[in-house]
Swiss-Prot record:
It comes from Pan troglodytes. This is Cytochrome c oxidase subunit 3. GO terms for cellular component: mitochondrial inner membrane; mitochondrion; respiratory chain complex IV. It catalyses: 4 Fe(II)-[cytochrome c] + O2 + 8 H(+)(in) = 4 Fe(III)-[cytochrome c] + 2 H2O + 4 H(+)(out). Gene3D superfamilies: 1.10.287.70, Cytochrome c oxidase, subunit III, four-helix bundle. Residues 1-15, 67-72, 153-155, 224-232 are mitochondrial matrix.
Length: 261
């Protein structure tokens, strides 16, 4: 902030946007190689480059915000707007999956037997594992709110406990979802039902894994005394993201598991 007459963070030159773009090129090329030639070398290289880029870029962001004081109130306001826009883009991303599901289920074609679920498909019972998954995610929504309130009250120990509980519930949800996939009587290849089911719930599962990782980083940062009641946007963004994941699951449960079965 030296020799600066404004509160905005003037970011110094960084290699991470370039390495991030390179990793995106390697991953997309690697996916094509994997799909067509069954070679995972390029994809592995892309994933490794992407992981290293994310780690080092966010490490720099944490240093700038926590130790160098660059995340002033106007900068934090910009970060909040950025996170809100990101979550909005995710809402539209999932809207596409719901559109595909309702387009297929509200007016089933003769090829599907004229009804939904299509002929030959045995849907999962919504009152078994899906209902347990719903309970787990709702409980995690309560625990992340508990963590937030504990942070605002400067109760460090309760914040750590609540955050750890949230992460464990996220892990439990992921394991339940994986077991459900392995035991499912249909696959992603079973027509439009299998496609919409596995793509929608699979992308949600991916978001749960991302959110759990996000919260794990927040737990590590809390253990390192990075957060205060006045300065904790990293945790706030993770909590917003987790609540978004919760709400999307409720729509998935009601639409695909309950109504769709």
């Amino acid at each position: 902030m030296t020799h600066q007459s404004h509160a905005y963070h003037m970011v110094k030159p960084s290699p991470w946007p370039l390495t991030g773009a390179l990793s995106a090129l390697l991953m997309t090329s690697g996916l094509a190689m994997w799909f067509h030639f069954y070679s995972t070398t390029l994809l592995t290289l892309g994933l490794l480059t992407n992981t290293l880029t994310m780690y080092q870029w966010w490490r720099d962001v944490m240093r700038e915000g926590t130790y160098q004081g660059h995340h002033t109130p106007p900068v934090q306001k910009g970060l909040r707007y950025g996170m809100i826009l990101f979550i909005t883009s995710e809402v539209f991303f999932f809207a596409g999956f719901f559109w595909a599901f309702y387009h297929s289920s509200l007016a089933p074609t003769p090829q599907l037997g004229g009804h939904w679920p299509p002929t030959g498909i045995t849907p999962l019972n919504p009152l078994e594992v899906p209902l347990l998954n719903t309970s787990v995610l709702l409980a995690s929504g309560v625990s992340i709110t508990w963590a937030h309130h504990s942070l605002m009250e400067n109760n460090r120990n309760q914040m750590i406990q609540a955050l750890l509980i949230t992460i464990l519930l996220g892990l439990y949800f992921t394991l339940l979802q994986a077991s459900e996939y392995f035991e499912s009587p249909f696959t992603i290849s079973d027509g439009i039902y299998g496609s919409t089911f596995f793509v929608a719930t699979g992308f949600h599962g991916l978001h749960v894994i991302i959110g759990s990782t996000f919260l794990t980083i927040c737990l590590i940062r809390q253990l390192m005394f990075h957060f205060t009641s006045k300065h904790h946007f990293g945790f706030q963004a993770a909590a917003w993201y987790w609540h978004f994941v919760d709400v999307v699951w409720l729509f998935l449960y009601v639409s695909i598991y309950w109504w769709g079965s």
